[in-house]
Amino acid sequence: MIKNSFLILILIVFSSFFNIVSAQQTVFNVPSADVTEKGHSFLQQEAQFRGWEPGPFFLGTTFSGYGIGHNTEIDATLFNVGAPATNSITLGTGFKSVMPIAGLKDKYPKREYKFTAGSQVLSSLQSQGVGNWTYSHLSGRLPVTNTRLTAGVSYGTKQVFGTNQAVFMGAIEQPVTKKLNLISDWFSGSEHFSGFLITGISYACPKNKTLYVGYQIPNSSRCGKSGFVLQFGKVF
C-alpha cells in the first residue's frame, strides 16, 4: 500500500510539470555553470524517492529562475516537500551569476572556463527561522572528451541542510551525443541535503525540455537513504 501511494504521488507531480515545463539550473543538486538567458524563465521539478523498505520516502524540490542579463538570473526554490512530512519546508530566494574567466574566455573559448556564485535567503515555512545558502565554484571543459568538471564550496544553514554546514561540492558532465549526457554530482557533508552522491543521465527533449534520471547514495545514514532521482526542466 505504501509503495502504491508513493508511485501515485510521483506520477501526479511529474505529469503536471512535464506538460507545463535548454538551460540547466543544476547538474542534479550542484548548481550548474549555465544561466537562464535574459527574458527567459526556467522551471525544474525534482523528485527523490524510494518505494521499498526500510524507509520508503518522497522528497520534492522545485527550482525556478528568470534571466535578467549580465550573466545573472534571479532564483526561487521550494525545498523539502515530502512524505513522510519533513517539517522543514523552506522557500529560498536569491540569485546565481555565471562569469567567463577573464583572460581565458578568448584564449580558450571551447574550454568554457567559468566562475559561478550564488546565494539564497532561506525562509522556513514551518517555524524554523531564516537562514542562508551561499556557494561558488570553478568549472571548465577538458580537451578531446569535452567533459565539464566543476568544483567549489557551499555553505548552508539548518533550514535546508539539517545543520549549518560548509562543504565541498563537485560535478562531472560528460556529453555522449548532442542530447545525452552522463552526469554526477556530490556534496561532501554529513547531514541531509548536503551529503549525497547522485549519478545518472540527462537527456534534451523537444520544446526546450530536459529529463534527468539518477540514483542517489548518501555519505552516511544521517544524510538520508539511497533512492532514485527524477527531474524535468523547461525553459520558457
Spell out what each predicted region is:
Residues 22-160, 175-236:
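Transmembrane beta-barrel domains of Gram-negative outer membranes and organellar outer membranes
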